[in-house]
């Protein structure tokens, strides 16, 4: 059965932004204009189509990325029908992981900014993630009807704070309550949307006289940006001083796809202005699946390979999200990179080494679903019936297996103990937590060996609140939650040479392992794939004083001891161990003996190497009206915060600070009462840093008591 839509007419895009930039409203309008939803869902009525979990509707934020398929032929029906797969991503920093996994499977993104508050901390995080995956993007400056909205100021912030080369393709006509429409700098006409039909129709009129000069300046800048795409465009531009509209679009598209420029659009989704122009921009400037580089992967033997976006290549897809659906059970969202998959086909999961059969395939329209018979390269769909798949796994052809690059997930920074309110719920709670952990890799569950408590860990207080809330709603488990615990770490500050010997003689065969190891601090670094290097082992044994087969176990022993720490039982990071001497016994030495000797060496050596405790430091940004600035800063100082800088923004002052996570619990309530509800804040993990001695002593005492 042939394709319904040619691959070059596909667009897989994400809509990402800061918490309140109006992302979900923008997506709602897109669904309305593309004819998918007949009544516009407003977020503040708790009715938006894309926000389908109960908590999202209550809290007015988007938590899980809903995937939706829709079609668009242009504002003037100027294109053939294009198929747009949209993923609406959350903007709250505790759910960065959802954004990360969406960007991993998208080909392009629309980043939404608020016209008045501009570039906010979360926007920086999203931007960094999009850079990491090389995602071409366009910008929509929304909420142009809000007080303090200023399109050109926001473009300036994107240049300075995000270091992006922004090229406006529109200019706003009026702002705040006088926002009327936009100037299209390519056609050099003003677009005025009609209020009467929720902006479905519009008029093309002449540019208002007072904006003519500025529009011409911006058009020149845009034309120069387009001319830089190729030598022929540049030559023509230098000779004639002008490019045709088609040439401008062609040049801009080439540079967006090369990630050299970012085009800026503006409007107000809530007031139904500007969204269709962004949809045209998606079609005109963002890539089809076969216009992005072929996806890199490796064979099962670790040889590099690639899969290009074509139905004729062997099947390969990435499972980028799991969700539990009340009617059909487990849904596995997949992005198909190559080949074709029909319902009922068997696929191979090389990460788990297992064969699975796909029961049914459904296409999601927010939380409504339509069953389909097959998916092809470029499609995003959900499979029903896969049993043993986790987020980030590859699904591929049985005969030509490849492993797509794994997704990388951050380590949680906060933990709480949970226990079911009734003993009868213990098993239900375990099942619920297991399902939630499979869905969300930044959420971990473990049992504390000493206390037997169930400990859940995540990216922030809101993240864990929502997990506990979902246990109650979706799995009917009521749980008591303990006080939040910080994910402390341990490390060493000095260098030491440690001589450790493990000898045991008790009749029969003894045990003998002797090592001399140099321990020194290691700078914790992150590689291109985002993996952290926290331990390095160097083998400098010469002349066989320790036989080869015992060297691996020494490293293993040290690593195992690192997970248990040496001061207060917290995992260690930043250790370099060099094994340079030792001895062995012909009969009594064994792998086990050397493993124990390795772990003893670290335990004894770390204390001499000035071991210390590290705590997570958060980057906190508080937006506060001028009147409460003194209180906010005084409070951050009391929380051991270091103020990094101050900025202006239309809603007041922005204070940036580095504050230990341990001091930030319950901050949301404090900052609200301090400012009578007018200040807001966001925080994300920045780094680990040493805990002051007096606090470290308390931590060690309470852990060891």
Curated annotation (Swiss-Prot):
Disulfide bonds: none annotated. One of its GO terms (molecular function) is GTPase activity. It comes from the Bacteria. Gene3D superfamilies: 3.30.230.10, 3.30.70.240, Elongation Factor G (Translational Gtpase), domain 3, P-loop containing nucleotide triphosphate hydrolases, Translation factors. Residues 8-290 form the tr-type G domain. It holds the Pfam family EFG_C. SUPFAM superfamilies: EF-G C-terminal domain-like, P-loop containing nucleoside triphosphate hydrolases, Ribosomal protein S5 domain 2-like, Translation proteins. Keywords: Cytoplasm, Elongation factor, GTP-binding, Nucleotide-binding, Protein biosynthesis. The keyword Cytoplasm applies. One of its GO terms (cellular component) is cytoplasm. GTP binds at residues 17-24, 88-92, 142-145. It is found in: Cytoplasm. GO terms for biological process: ribosome disassembly. NCBIfam families: EF-G, PRK12740.1-5, small_GTP. Catalyzes the GTP-dependent ribosomal translocation step during translation elongation. During this step, the ribosome changes from the pre-translocational (PRE) to the post-translocational (POST) state as the newly formed A-site-bound peptidyl-tRNA and P-site-bound deacylated tRNA move to the P and E sites, respectively. Catalyzes the coordinated movement of the two tRNA molecules, the mRNA and conformational changes in the ribosome. This is Elongation factor G. It comes from Francisella philomiragia subsp. philomiragia (strain ATCC 25017 / CCUG 19701 / FSC 153 / O#319-036). The gene is fusA.
């Amino acid at each position: 059965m042939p394709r319904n839509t040619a691959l070059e007419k596909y667009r897989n895009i994400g809509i990402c932004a800061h918490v309140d930039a109006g992302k979900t409203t923008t997506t709602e309008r897109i669904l309305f204009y593309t004819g998918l939803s007949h009544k516009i869902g407003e977020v503040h009525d708790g009715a938006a189509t894309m926000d389908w979990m109960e908590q999202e509707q209550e809290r007015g934020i988007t938590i899980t990325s809903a995937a939706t398929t829709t079609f668009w032929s242009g504002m003037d029906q100027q294109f053939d029908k294009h198929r747009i797969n949209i993923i609406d991503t959350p903007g709250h920093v505790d759910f960065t992981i959802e954004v990360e996994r969406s960007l991993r499977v998208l080909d392009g993104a629309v980043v939404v900014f608020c016209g008045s508050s501009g570039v906010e901390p979360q926007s920086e995080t999203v931007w960094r993630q999009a850079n990491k995956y090389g995602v071409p993007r366009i910008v929509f400056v929304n909420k142009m009807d809000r007080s303090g909205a200023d399109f050109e100021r926001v473009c300036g912030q994107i240049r300075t704070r995000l270091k992006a080369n922004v090229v406006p393709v529109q200019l706003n006509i009026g702002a705040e309550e006088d926002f009327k429409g936009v100037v299209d700098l390519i056609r050099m006409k003003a677009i005025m949307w009609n209020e009467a039909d929720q902006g479905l129709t519009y008029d093309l009129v002449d540019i208002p006289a007072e904006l003519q000069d500025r529009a011409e300046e911006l058009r020149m800048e845009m034309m120069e940006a387009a001319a830089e795409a190729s030598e022929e465009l540049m030559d023509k531009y230098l000779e004639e001083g002008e490019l045709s509209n088609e040439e401008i679009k062609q040049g801009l598209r080439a540079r967006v796809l090369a990630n050299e420029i970012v085009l800026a659009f503006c409007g107000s989704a809530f007031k139904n202005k500007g969204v269709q122009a962004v949809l045209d921009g998606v079609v005109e400037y963002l890539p089809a699946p076969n216009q992005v580089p072929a996806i890199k992967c490796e064979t099962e033997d670790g040889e590099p390979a690639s899969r290009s976006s074509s139905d004729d290549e062997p099947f390969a897809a990435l499972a980028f999200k799991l969700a539990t659906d009340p009617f059909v059970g487990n849904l596995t969202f997949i992005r198909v990179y190559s080949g074709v998959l029909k319902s009922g086909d068997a696929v191979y999961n090389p990460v788990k080494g297992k064969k699975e059969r796909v029961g049914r395939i459904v296409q999601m329209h927010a939380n409504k679903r339509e069953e389909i018979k097959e998916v092809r390269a470029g499609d995003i769909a959900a499979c029903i019936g896969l049993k043993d798949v986790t987020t980030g796994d590859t699904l591929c052809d049985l005969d030509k297996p490849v492993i797509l690059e794994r997704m990388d997930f951050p380590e949680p920074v906060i933990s709480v103990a949970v226990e079911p309110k009734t003993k009868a719920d213990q098993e239900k709670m375990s099942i619920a937590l297991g399902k939630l952990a499979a869905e969300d890799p930044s959420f971990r569950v473990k049992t504390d060996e000493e206390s037997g408590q169930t400990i859940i860990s995540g990216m922030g207080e809101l993240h864990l609140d929502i997990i506990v809330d979902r246990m109650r709603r979706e799995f009917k488990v009521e749980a008591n939650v303990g006080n939040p615990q910080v994910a402390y770490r341990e490390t060493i500050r000095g260098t030491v040479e440690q001589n450790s010997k493990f000898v045991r003689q008790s009749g029969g065969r003894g045990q003998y392992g002797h090592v001399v190891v140099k321990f020194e601090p290691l700078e914790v670094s992150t590689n291109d794939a985002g993996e952290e290097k926290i331990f390095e082992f160097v083998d400098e044994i010469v002349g066989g004083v320790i036989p080869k087969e015992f060297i691996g176990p020494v490293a293993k022993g040290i690593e195992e001891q690192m997970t248990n720490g040496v001061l207060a039982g917290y995992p260690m990071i930043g250790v370099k161990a060099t094994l340079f001497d030792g001895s062995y016994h012909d009969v009594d030495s064994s792998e086990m003996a050397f493993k124990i000797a390795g772990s003893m060496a670290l335990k004894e050596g770390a204390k001499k190497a000035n071991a210390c405790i590290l705590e997570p430091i958060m980057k906190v940004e508080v937006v506060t009206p001028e009147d409460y600035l003194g209180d906010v800063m005084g409070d951050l100082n009391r929380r051991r915060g270091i103020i990094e800088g101050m900025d202006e923004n239309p809603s007041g002052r922005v204070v940036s600070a580095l504050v230990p996570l341990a001091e930030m619990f319950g901050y949301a309530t404090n900052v609200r009462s301090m400012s009578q509800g007018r200040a807001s804040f966001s925080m994300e993990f920045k780094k680990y840093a040493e805990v002051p001695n007096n606090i470290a002593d308390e931590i060690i005492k309470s852990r060891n008591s």
